[in-house]
Design a protein with these regions (language model features):
Chain B
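N-terminal intrinsically disordered, cationic/polar leader segments
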Residues: 1-97
Length: 449, 97
């Protein structure tokens, strides 16, 4: 039996623990857990459920902390399957994931199940990832702390899909759902990287009226949005849409008229979550619409520029966002593989983090293939995928944008940190990573004690 | 050279290393904790051993708490802690530096 949850409450989630506690206490066994992702607040109870034989299989975007550590040490019977957000939608639509019961927490619903994520104490904005579960689960249970008068609109989840509604005291902790006001980073390294990312974008042929972009939620990504704003005003360029996980600085661009539409699959901060209900141009999209490679057309197919992060990048431009430098699972695919199909995919990352090189001869785990990566931006300079000679021509003479080969950046990193010993793994596979089309891209093995 | 007193150098900040030397009788004995132990345990010991041998320290207990320090940081902290442990902070051994 397969059960699912969404992770829109992120670190403020109460629903997951309440439901899992009840499932464990009722003595269920051999369940497959298929949430959109797993946050730290879910770790302890998942580890307990695995130890008691309640959960024997997991498919997720990612995992981290004590759960990632336990899985990397071989606690789970079956290998975890990691899927991107677009791939999860594909897998559910195609029947690769068959959800028996979806338990979806919502900050409001009426007594028939018309619900959205935009309003209420525990509002988180877009219900993007959960909408797939709502549409395809055999049985759908909504859990809420806020029953509204019938009929409740806008209805992101509709009464036609809902079997049960359960009222509890609190579905989430609003202070931990999204980060508060996002501050402009003061880290000089992040600022330098962000400025160079901006230089790459605005000096490429993609920077023209009606372009589109996706940024992440990290410090550098937020700073890129600010730099991009200034350049868009200076050059009088407006974007057709911003896509993906949305932050307040992106909503600000919408309100200033610099971006025509925000296509919103999740909201990373309060500002973005709260503005959705008042802004018809901040459009909620589900994970399939966002990024499913097997439906009749996903938004990422129209995406011009994507700015993504990385734990490791290798000299073949492959990216790892899943396993740490110690080989232990500590990340999530998220929309990485999906957004990386953009026409200009930029990875922004520091050359080294502490004594760990970011650019390495070979990544520990391949998550996003090098063929979909176009430019790497570090604080010392950029590297362009040699398959993109067109970008090479556009970017080779930009002041303040030193161009290196990826091999030269790798050597620079190794010179700073030294040569690490190779990691030791056993032969047992503890997790498999799929590419967004459902094919196998890499496996993660159990770490040696 | 003999360790004259227990000494410590460095902090527990990210990218730093804290090294403590105490008197030993059984060669150079390491107690190493590191965020990057899987990749760099031998590299860290090699750097510290090199500095110890330049000061001709043969019997010592070396407690290392490493927070991902780069090699040059480890070397600098080791020089500092050895000078303190040998009670020669006023007479730096310039040829080692």
């Amino acid at each position: 039996m397969t059960i699912s949850f969404h992770h829109h409450f992120r670190e403020g989630d109460y629903v997951f623990n309440i439901i899992m506690r009840s499932i464990i206490d009722h003595g269920y066994k051999n369940l497959t857990l298929a949430p959109s992702s797993l946050t730290n607040v879910m770790n302890d109870i998942v580890v307990e459920a695995i130890k008691k034989g309640v959960v024997t299989g997991i498919t997720s975007s990612g995992m981290r902390g004590s759960l990632g550590d336990a899985v990397s040490h071989g606690i789970l019977k079956n290998p975890v399957i990691f899927r991107s957000h677009g791939n999860r939608a594909r897998a559910i639509e195609s029947g690769d994931i068959k959800i028996d019961v979806a338990f979806l927490g919502v900050p409001n619903t009426d007594d028939m199940g018309n619900a959205n994520g935009m309003d209420g104490v525990a509002a988180f904005g877009s219900l993007g990832y959960a909408l797939i579960d709502a549409q395809y689960a055999n049985t759908l249970v909504l859990i809420t702390d806020n029953i509204k008068p019938y009929p409740n609109t806008p209805a992101s989840i509709k009464q036609t899909q809902v079997d049960y509604i359960v009222q509890i005291n609190e579905v989430g902790n609003p202070d931990k759902i999204g980060s508060g006001a996002t501050r402009f980073t003061k880290d000089p390294k992040e600022l330098k990287i962000a400025k160079m990312v901006n230089d790459v974008i605005v000096n490429s042929d993609y920077f023209k009226n009606d372009f589109s972009f996706q940024t992440g939620s990290g410090g550098a990504a937020l700073a890129v949005t600010r730099f991009l704003r200034t350049t868009m005003i200076d050059k009088n360029i407006k974007a057709a849409f911003a896509l993906g996980g949305i932050t307040k600085p992106t909503v600000d661009l919408l309100n200033e008229g610099l971006v025509a539409k925000v296509m919103d699959v999740q909201d990373f901060d309060k500002g973005a979550a709260e503005s959705m209900k008042d802004n018809p141009y901040q459009q909620e999209i589900d994970a399939s619409w966002y990024a499913d490679p097997a439906n009749k057309g996903a938004m990422v197919d129209k995406l011009d520029v994507a700015i993504l992060s990385a734990l490791e990048i290798d000299t073949k431009f492959n990216v790892n966002v899943m396993s740490g430098s110690d080989g232990i699972i500590r990340g999530a695919i998220g929309g990485h593989q999906d957004a990386a199909t953009a026409k200009l995919t930029i990875i922004s990352a520091p050359l080294v983090r502490g004594r760990i090189a970011t650019i390495v001869p070979e990544v520990t785990t391949v998550i996003t293939p090098g063929d979909s990566i176009d430019v790497i931006v570090t604080e010392v300079g950029i590297a362009i995928n040699p398959k993109r000679q067109d970008l090479m021509a556009q970017l080779k003479n930009v002041p303040g944008l030193p161009l290196y080969t990826i091999e030269a950046l790798q050597e620079k990193a190794e010179k700073i940190v030294g040569t690490p010993k190779p990691l030791q793994f056993t032969d047992r596979v503890v997790a498999v990573a799929e590419y967004r089309d459902g094919t196998l891209i890499d496996v993660i093995k159990q770490v040696k004690e | 050279m003999e360790i004259k007193k227990t000494a410590i150098a460095g902090t527990l900040e990210s990218s730093d290393v804290q090294i403590m030397l105490t008197q030993g009788t059984d060669g150079i004995v390491f107690d190493l904790v590191s965020d990057v132990v899987k990749q760099f345990d031998e590299a860290i010991k090699k750097t510290i051993n090199q500095v110890l041998s330049e000061y001709d320290v043969q019997n010592v207990i070396v407690k290392v708490v490493d927070k991902g320090a780069l090699d040059m940081v480890i070397k600098a902290r080791t020089v500092a802690v050895v000078q303190r442990a040998l009670d020669i902070v006023d007479e730096p051994k310039w040829e080692v530096l």
